[in-house]
A protein has these predicted regions:
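Extracytoplasmic/periplasmic substrate-binding proteins
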Residues: 46, 213, 218-221, 249-341
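Short, solvent-exposed loop/beta-turn-alpha elements that line the ligand-binding surface or hinge
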Residues: 121-135, 221-249, 299, 310-319, ...
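Extracytoplasmic/periplasmic solute-binding protein
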Residues: 145-158, 163, 187-239, 284
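Conserved N-terminal structural module of periplasmic/extracytoplasmic solute-binding proteins
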Residues: 23-25, 36-116, 125-132, 179, ...
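Extracytoplasmic/periplasmic substrate-recognition and gating elements
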Residues: 61, 65, 92, 151, ...
């Protein structure tokens, strides 16, 4: 997954070093740190939006209440901060016992290779997680000898994610534009909006990954689920090439939008998070991003959510997505009691009870709701749940492109501004992605 959210409790680098130094001094002074106790769990998560954080705090309190004597020592970090610090912290012995970790070669794959994560297959059997989530979803947390999608399972996620098309019903209605049913209709709608002086798309490319999601979502909407094998092979490191006509055409279209005035003015200087807030305030007709923004988007009742409309001839279009960062147990869980407590914690985080709590807060749970659950669903979440059911039924849940290599996210982030500004061609953009991927395949051999 490639999303970034605003921080609520992030230590600057100098404070992190100071905290580590103080922790080391405490160990020397007292011989045994609190983090070493089996009943004291250091947990890192990426739930840094206010609504998400409130859910995690509630679930943590409930877990502590059900396990007297257990204390959750929580640290919340943004996606990008997690990528920068997690592997180093666990390697140094200063990290969490339980953590969220991004699937894919750059994070989970690298940590598994270095022995920094523990397999959770025993807990899958013990708690029946394979009854709560499909095997195709759990496969996104499997690694074996550098191979993605096979072997032992190293995590499980609590939230489902879909990248789709947010739209502002009022703006579209005032402009006399109907919701598009096909990709061709979407293109026509964008032209109508632009002619009326309305920014067709909200966009922010200064920080975060809105452009990446836009390119990936458009490309995968043009892939029928019956033809997904090529994409699966790319993501799971089995081979192939990013240098395809479909990827080039998607990059070309997004570049044309950027150069042709289809994006909100000044998008180059706006971060992805700020672009979302502008969209919520009523700026822009459409925005392509993921369900992780449901909690914020629900504050504007005019905002709806739908799949990227498929082009004619595609009956089961794919959607970028899958699940949020996985809950995992690190190698810092040294003892069996600590590992078992970590397993119990993760079980609660992916339970039907937790799923209902997330749903009540407006977020899309990866675990199916219990038959007798009666959450208060927002219109956005209702749309998301129906999309989730359809995508899973059609085997059309796609992938985040950055999962395909350890360095792909950086490669895409470095080159997307160049693509949008017209400083590189769509062909060069895709070629850069493919060179990154081919180098990764070569290094794996």
């Amino acid at each position: 997954m490639t999303r970034t959210v605003k921080s609520i409790s992030i230590l600057p680098a100098y404070r992190l070093k100071a905290a580590v130094a103080l922790a080391g001094a405490a160990l020397l002074s007292f011989g045994l740190s609190a983090a070493a106790r089996a009943d004291d769990l250091a947990v890192w998560d990426d739930q840094t939006y206010e609504g998400q954080s409130a859910v995690i705090e509630q679930l943590n309190k409930e877990f502590e209440a059900a396990h007297p004597g257990v204390m959750i020592k929580r640290t919340a970090r943004t996606f990008d901060d997690m990528k920068l610090t997690l592997k180093l912290a666990v390697s140094a012995g200063d990290g969490p016992v339980i953590t969220k970790v991004n699937q894919g070669a750059g994070d989970m794959g690298a940590m598994v290779k270095e022995g920094l994560l523990l397999p959770v297959d025993d807990y899958i059997k013990q708690y029946g997680w394979d009854k709560l989530q499909s095997d195709s979803v759990l496969a996104r947390d499997r690694w074996e000898d550098g191979k993605f999608g096979v072997g032992k399972t190293y995590g499980i996620s609590g939230l489902g994610e879909i990248v789709g098309l947010y739209y502002n019903k009022k703006i579209l209605g005032d402009a006399g534009v109907a919701l598009p049913q096909t990709f061709e209709e979407l293109l026509a709608d964008l032209d109508k909006l632009k002619e009326k002086g309305i920014a067709p798309f909200m966009m922010g490319s200064a920080k975060q990954h809105l452009a990446l999601h836009m390119i990936g979502a458009i490309d995968q909407a043009h892939i029928d689920a019956s033809n997904r094998a090529e994409l699966d092979d790319l993501i799971y490191g089995r081979g192939g090439s990013w240098n395809t006509k479909g990827n080039i055409e998607s990059a070309k279209l997004v570049q044309q939008w950027a150069q042709g005035g289809y994006f909100f003015p000044g998008f180059e200087g706006i971060s992805g998070d700020d672009a979302v807030q502008l969209f919520i305030s009523g700026q822009g007709a459409f925005l392509i991003s993921g369900t992780w923004y449901f909690g914020d988007m629900q504050h504007n009742p005019d905002i709806g959510f739908m799949a990227i409309p498929a082009p004619k001839g595609i009956s089961k279009p794919m959607s970028v997505g899958g699940v949020d960062l996985a809950w995992a147990i690190t190698s810092l869980a040294k003892t069996k009691p600590t590992q078992d407590l970590a397993g119990a914690y993760i079980d609660y985080m992916v339970s039907e009870k937790a799923a209902e709590t997330w749903a009540n807060a407006g977020y899309l749970p990866a675990t199916s709701l219990a038959a007798d659950a009666k959450p208060k669903l927002t219109p956005l979440l209702s749309s998301g749940i129906e999309m989730w059911k359809t995508l899973n039924a059609n085997d059309a849940l796609g992938h985040y492109p950055d999962w395909s290599s350890p360095t792909m996210l950086k490669t895409i982030d470095d080159n997307t501004p160049l693509l949008l500004s017209g400083n590189i061609t769509p062909e060069a953009f895709v070629d850069t992605m493919d060179k990154d991927y081919q180098a990764y395949l070569k290094d794996k051999k």
